[in-house]
């Protein structure tokens, strides 16, 4: 009789590797505990002079962005789910496409658009409106404006999912009980929207805290920009580590808040009724369409037009051999990270196949997947510290491998959650049957298991591919010198205010992003739910 | 009390109800029964106002409802499922329609109704924590809370399992009777229609087939459809023995002294009774759904007695 | 046959690599490409170069220090050069050519790096808004008369950090702080690059801005009609703040001799002319000619009292100061 069964070995290996996966975070804590002597001056400066401002800025930004996004998302959800607005299918797509824009691209588009010498303010000044014409856009309100336009889908989608499940009969029942539309709205519809709205708001909060590129364009100081400043200008790894720990705390707080809120969702039975609740008369219909139009214009149409116009001006100069090497680097990185995540995800999912009843699985699985919940800057510092301790020298010696590992760690969750749900549907009896027929494990894997998951594997690869192409902070911090990608080039150009030159690469990334957003909405997957 | 005159309703391009006429008296429990798609839900919806008729009149206590909005009609409705507001507790659901009442009065009413269905202990629960039967009970008393003039039930028992269905139906019937409520229940279940109501409206293809008491419907079906729907006998087709008249509807009973011989071709046991389909040998004539306590075997010869015969053309 | 060709390839590449230098530079490629090619043509020594941000390059050199693949670190701004040397990344180079061609205040006190071209961080005015002959200085711009008229580049750029470091070195921390505070109090408009500062001044959004001379040169070359002109600040006091682009030999470099020769060449006549020309900077060698555009800006008094080594030393203080007064 075996003392240690294969199953036990499998369990222990999984546990072991999950602890390994947690190492970057562990090292953040280890290194952040004591500050090295040469960093003490920088850290004291950062702690006393910089951090209070960061807290204030972060707080401001999160609150304003949440308010802005909610103001867009809630009415939109009502209009799209509960009324008979025309062209619903079109709006379904246009309200989710803004997710294709990396926030830093939206940021530089609008900073360029609203800058003093730009079209809008110049027009106001020439028309005689001096206060408007000298308006400053580069403040918390400007950032929140951009964030709201880019992040409102994260609130819109959860609310829509809930409203979809509200049976038309409930509305009829309410009317039969003698109550007005307003009463139904107040007592049933709005309360039902609260949980998905708050869950969406925490996700917006997480994205705001994690953003690096957009706030850099606005010259707005946040934890992420300070981590980068400590890393690259102050050359204080100790400060960067400690700032990362602070940001880590906030991110995890928001993450747990979201899980907690989501659990409070009242279970709703799916309903098939297609009927629109509120059939709008002409005036409200016009108002709703205008609102939809305005949101679509600012979140989608204007950014694209501006990008295309700028690209057109710049493309003759920009489209040099240099640009092709940028694209090559971006694609290569995306390809290799996509491939490694695919392989690791498949291994993980296979390892998890008989463990779903085990109570320890969710916790330890989260160790593998935690990278996605954390801002890129933090992951970069953590991975850097890990290898600094393993190698004993600067991890920059690892070259491209460092940034590939960092990105794999960051986006593993994307691959895993695209494959795992379908893999769980595979009946464990298949494998037993295959074994009983005398086939080796590998035969089963290659002839049955993998083919079953082929579609999901392709999707996983594609989703990771796009996320890596768009990613900026981690790539910026861990890449070998001279190895620029589209995103890092955009950072460099936008930090110098060179909007036109940045637009060409940005356009490429946006098109890439749009194809996956469209793919996801066709597949029916909800991006916001899985975050 | 509820008078429907020449009601015609169109859904899309289809005429779903055509020239529907009936009169519902106060304090009566009515069943509206018919096959799927016959328009019974549409009829309910026209009464409550979810649907606007093409032509015709719906009057409640003599008042034309056409211009009265749903909120003001004082007609309650209980659906088949998914009826309770999911974010409100049992108590809050029931209070929903009477939220404008003075607090003491309102609380009394809610307590009274909760006790009626024995759900007082569950008053703080949310709908998803209740069983199917409990949910429907709550839905019914919620509809009753604002003391509507008329209660409509759209297949309200159809999603429950048979035993529960039967039990709940009896319970609700008692409650409605005790409250002297006027109620129209839509169902596709014949047993339900027969057992629940004082009167039955049989609907098919958007037209009223018959309106009468359950025994009238069963014993004297007005036409072929009603007869076949309730399975209570048969029209004699052709080649019938002399005692039977062609084209006539015959009511038969199994009896040792019977004059006509038949063979058992089908046998069903339901609710303590056997129901047989009996075929006259060498003939197309077949009597369906004849009840008898005795256990006959398939292919056994059974004698039947002619009780009554009439032609649909007469009535 | 296979092994023979492999061997010959290895031999060839080994030979080909016999004479080459590796340079890590933060200068833009198009500014250094041609100079490197010229050296190659003249001496046969191939210059391999990698470009990148100064901070990243420094990290990489640090990582390679025990066995460096790089020979020369070339960058802009004394702050970066100081940091590289303070981290022990650069060799102290003995060279009479270098010490004679590069003035003392433009090279490291221990000769670990040498300036190769000079740029001035000067005030540029809108000719319609500021009269000729107005007394202008970095300190002057802190006074309330200049409220609403000042445009500056962001404090995050190392050029401004060195400028403020210079002010600290000249006036002491507290006085420097009050000067920068004065800039901020004058509702200064912040821009992400020097060219945008210049454009804003030209458009009238502000009357004066502080930029590096070559940015002015580039813009004026493209759009000569702009109402912009250099007005040299601090001519009555210590002179205009200058900075350098420079280079040093990396510690433990495997080609110290060749690297030194290259640096000496860069600091000599022909290279200096090309170096300065390509980016409209001032040559480090006094006798090297300036380009016409640069000459047209006239003579000015540069700040020779401030040793640029100190710009690096004081950089951290400068960042702290700018943060304290809210200069973004």
Residue ranges of predicted features:
Chain C
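Sec/Tat signal peptide C-region and signal peptidase I cleavage site
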Residues: 12-18
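Sec-dependent N-terminal signal peptides
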Residues: 3-12
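A ligand-binding cleft/hinge motif common to bilobed small-molecule-binding domains
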Residues: 79-83, 202, 207-227
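Mature extracytoplasmic/periplasmic domains
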Residues: 245-305
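Extracellular/periplasmic bilobal clamshell ligand-binding domains
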Residues: 292-328
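Extracytoplasmic ligand-binding site segments that recognize negatively charged/polar headgroups
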Residues: 26, 30-33, 69-205, 238
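A beta-strand-loop signature enriched in Asp, Gly, Thr, and Trp
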Residues: 214-248
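Early extracytoplasmic/lumenal segment of secretory-pathway proteins
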Residues: 18-82, 328
């Amino acid at each position: 009789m075996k003392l240690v069964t294969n199953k036990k070995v499998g369990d222990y290996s999984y546990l072991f590797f999950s602890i390994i996966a947690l190492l970057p975070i562990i090292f953040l804590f280890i290194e952040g505990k004591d500050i090295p002597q040469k960093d003490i001056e920088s850290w004291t400066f950062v702690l006393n002079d910089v951090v209070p401002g960061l807290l204030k800025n972060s707080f401001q930004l999160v609150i304003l962005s949440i308010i802005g996004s909610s103001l867009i998302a809630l009415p939109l959800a009502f209009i799209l789910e509960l009324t008979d607005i025309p062209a619903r299918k079109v709006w379904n797509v246009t309200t989710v496409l803004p997710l294709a824009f990396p926030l830093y691209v939206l940021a530089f588009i609008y900073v360029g658009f609203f800058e003093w010498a730009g079209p809008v303010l110049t027009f106001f000044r020439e028309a005689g409106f001096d206060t408007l014409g000298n308006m400053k856009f580069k403040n918390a309100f400007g950032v929140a404006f951009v964030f709201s336009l880019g992040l409102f889908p994260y609130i819109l989608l959860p609310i829509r999912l809930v409203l979809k499940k509200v049976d038309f009969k409930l509305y009829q029942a309410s009317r039969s009980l003698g109550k007005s539309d307003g009463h139904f709205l107040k007592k049933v519809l709005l309360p039902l929207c609260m949980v998905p709205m708050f869950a969406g708001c925490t996700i917006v909060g997480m994205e705001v805290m994690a953003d690096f590129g957009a706030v850099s364009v606005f010259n707005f100081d946040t934890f992420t920009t300070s981590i980068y400043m400590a890393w690259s200008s102050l050359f204080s790894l100790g400060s960067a580590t400690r700032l990362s720990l602070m940001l880590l705390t906030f991110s995890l707080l928001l993450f747990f808040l979201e899980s907690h809120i989501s659990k409070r969702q009242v279970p709703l039975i799916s309903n098939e009724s297609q009927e629109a609740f509120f059939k709008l008369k002409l005036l409200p219909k016009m108002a709703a369409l205008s609102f939809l139009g305005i949101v679509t214009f600012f979140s989608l149409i204007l950014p694209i037009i501006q990008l295309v116009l700028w690209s057109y001006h710049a493309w003759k100069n920009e489209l040099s051999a240099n640009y092709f090497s940028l694209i090559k680097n971006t694609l290569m990185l995306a390809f290799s990270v996509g491939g490694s995540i695919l392989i690791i995800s498949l291994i993980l999912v296979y390892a998890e196949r008989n463990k779903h009843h085990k109570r320890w699985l969710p916790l330890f699985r989260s160790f593998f997947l935690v990278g996605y919940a954390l801002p890129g800057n933090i992951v970069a510092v953590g991975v850097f510290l890990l290898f600094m301790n393993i190698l004993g020298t600067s991890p920059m010696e690892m070259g491209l491998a460092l940034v590939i590992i960092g990105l794999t760690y960051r986006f593993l969750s994307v691959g895993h959650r695209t494959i795992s749900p379908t893999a769980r549907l595979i009946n464990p009896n298949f494998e037993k049957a295959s074994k009983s027929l005398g086939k080796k494990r590998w035969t089963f894997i290659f002839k049955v298991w993998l083919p079953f998951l082929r579609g999901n594997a392709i999707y996983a690869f594609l989703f990771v591919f796009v996320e890596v192409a768009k990613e900026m902070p981690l790539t910026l911090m861990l890449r070998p010198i001279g190895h620029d990608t589209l995103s890092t080039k955009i950072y460099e150009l936008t930090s110098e205010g060179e909007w036109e030159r940045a637009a060409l690469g940005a356009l490429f990334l946006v098109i890439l992003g749009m194809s996956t957003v469209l793919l996801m909405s066709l597949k029916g997957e909800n991006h916001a739910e899985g975050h | 009390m509820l008078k429907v005159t020449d009601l015609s309703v169109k859904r899309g391009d289809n005429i779903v109800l055509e020239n529907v006429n009936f009169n519902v008296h106060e304090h009566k429990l009515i069943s509206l029964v018919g096959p799927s798609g016959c328009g019974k839900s549409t009829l309910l919806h026209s009464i409550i106002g979810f649907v606007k008729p093409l032509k015709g009149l719906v009057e409640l206590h003599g008042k034309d409802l056409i211009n009265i909005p749903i909120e003001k009609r004082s007609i309650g409705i209980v659906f088949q499922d998914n009826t309770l507001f999911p974010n409100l507790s049992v108590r809050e659901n029931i209070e929903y329609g009477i939220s404008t009442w003075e607090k003491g009065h309102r609380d009394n009413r809610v307590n009274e109704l909760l006790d009626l269905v024995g759900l007082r202990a569950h008053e703080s629960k949310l709908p998803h924590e209740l069983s199917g039967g409990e949910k429907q009970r709550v839905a019914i008393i919620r509809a009753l809370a604002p003391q509507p003039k008329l209660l409509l039930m759209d297949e309200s028992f159809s999603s429950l399992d048979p035993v529960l269905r039967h039990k709940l139906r009896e319970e609700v019937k008692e409650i409605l009777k005790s409250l002297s409520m006027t109620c129209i229940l839509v169902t596709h279940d014949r047993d339900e229609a027969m057992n629940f109501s004082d009167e039955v409206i049989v609907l098919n293809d958007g037209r009223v087939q018959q309106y009468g008491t359950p025994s009238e419907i069963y014993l004297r079906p007005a036409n072929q459809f009603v007869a076949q729907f309730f399975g209570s006998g048969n029209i004699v087709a052709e080649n019938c023995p002399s005692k039977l008249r062609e084209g006539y509807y015959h009511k038969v009973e199994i009896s040792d002294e019977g004059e006509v011989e038949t063979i058992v071709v089908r046998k069903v046991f339901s609710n303590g009774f056997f129901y047989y389909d009996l075929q006259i040998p060498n003939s197309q004539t077949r009597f369906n759904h004849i009840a008898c306590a005795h256990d006959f075997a398939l292919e056994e010869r059974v004698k039947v007695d002619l009780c009554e015969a009439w032609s649909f053309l007469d009535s | 046959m296979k092994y023979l060709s492999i061997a010959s390839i290895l031999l060839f590449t080994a030979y080909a690599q016999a004479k080459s230098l590796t340079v890590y530079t933060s200068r833009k490629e198009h500014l250094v490409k041609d100079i490197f090619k010229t050296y190659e043509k003249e001496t046969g020594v191939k210059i391999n170069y990698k470009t990148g941000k100064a901070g990243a390059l420094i990290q990489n050199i640090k990582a390679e220090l025990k066995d460096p693949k790089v020979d020369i670190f070339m960058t802009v701004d004394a702050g970066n050069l100081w940091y590289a040397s303070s981290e022990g990344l650069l060799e102290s180079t003995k060279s009479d050519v270098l010490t004679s061609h590069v003035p003392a205040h433009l090279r490291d006190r221990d000769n670990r790096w040498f300036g190769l071209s000079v740029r001035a961080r000067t005030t540029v005015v809108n000719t319609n808004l500021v009269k000729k002959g107005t007394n202008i200085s970095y300190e002057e711009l802190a006074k309330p008369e200049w409220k609403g008229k000042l445009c500056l580049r962001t404090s995050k750029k190392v050029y401004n950090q060195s400028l403020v470091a210079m002010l600290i070195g000249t006036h002491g921390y507290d006085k420097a702080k009050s000067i920068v505070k004065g800039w901020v109090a004058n509702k200064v408009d912040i821009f992400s690059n020097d060219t945008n500062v210049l454009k804003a001044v030209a458009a009238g959004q502000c009357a004066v801005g502080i930029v590096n001379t070559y940015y002015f040169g580039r813009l004026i070359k493209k759009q000569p009609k702009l109402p912009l002109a250099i007005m040299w600040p601090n001519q009555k006091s210590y002179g205009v703040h200058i900075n350098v682009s420079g280079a040093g030999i990396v510690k433990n470099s495997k080609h110290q001799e060749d690297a030194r020769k290259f640096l000496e060449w860069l600091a000599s006549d022909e290279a200096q002319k090309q170096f300065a020309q390509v980016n409209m900077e001032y040559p480090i060698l006094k006798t090297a000619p300036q380009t016409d555009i640069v000459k047209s800006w006239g003579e000015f008094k540069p700040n020779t009292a401030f040793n640029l080594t100190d710009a690096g030393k004081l950089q951290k203080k400068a960042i702290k100061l700018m943060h304290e007064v809210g200069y973004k």
